[in-house]
Amino acid sequence: MPTTDKTISQVFEEFLNDQEARLGPNTFSKYQTIIGLFESYLESYWPGHDQEEYNRLTEGGTFCGTFGPEEITAGYSEFLGYFIPHKVMCGKDTMKAAGTVTRKLAKWLADKRYAEDTADAQERAKEAVKDLPAAQEVLDLLDDFVDMNAPEKYDDEIEDHFWIKKIEPGKLWLEPLTMHDGTIGPVPVPKKVTQVCEEMWDIGGVVVKTKRGWRLLEVWKVTP
């Protein structure tokens, strides 16, 4: 079983030093950015630790200065699935880099024996390399579509997060998470959207019912 006295902060520094030796300046800058964002996430969310422990430890230290590298990959799902798409204002390049860098970090942790098994974390990061930029592309497409096609008159309005339940070319069927029972649709969207998005992605926005059926009124987030 891997053991070390190093903290997460020390291991992040070692990881970046190793990457700087092999990467060009532009690529290394992306690594620094993603590790900085990941460190900010860890300090804010303390994955795997409860509020009581958080209160006790923050009196005398930080998450990354307290815990060791075996704690790092526990935050991957929340970092890649929530923090990056919801809390970080960034483009597709940074989203792709988030998956690339965290995947490299997970493999590096296993190679260095700082973590025992990082296969699941590597797979989660691999998915993020594809899905996060794709979700941003869908958001951009829907933003443009809504700007041009948002209805002015409607009878019913649902502001919520919506699971994508069914996809056909140019059409989505959506399931509101909290505000409505059942699936609504078809909701017309650009065909490119239905080529890129996947079932069970989360669309945050407003859907309204018009005389011609359900339509998107606002879209503010798309999350894989």
PLM features: residue spans?
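Basic/polar, acidic-poor N-terminal "presequence/leader" segments
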Residues: 1-30
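Non-catalytic DNA-binding core/recognition domains of DNA-processing enzymes
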Residues: 24-109
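Flexible interdomain linker/hinge and immediately adjacent N-terminus
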Residues: 59-64, 121-146, 154
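Structural detector for short beta-strands of small beta-barrel domains
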Residues: 140-171
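OB-fold (S1/OB) nucleic-acid-binding surfaces
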Residues: 166-188
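Short nucleic-acid-contacting surface segments enriched for D/E, G, S/T with interspersed K/R
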Residues: 189-206
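OB-fold/S1-family single-stranded nucleic acid-binding modules
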Residues: 208-224
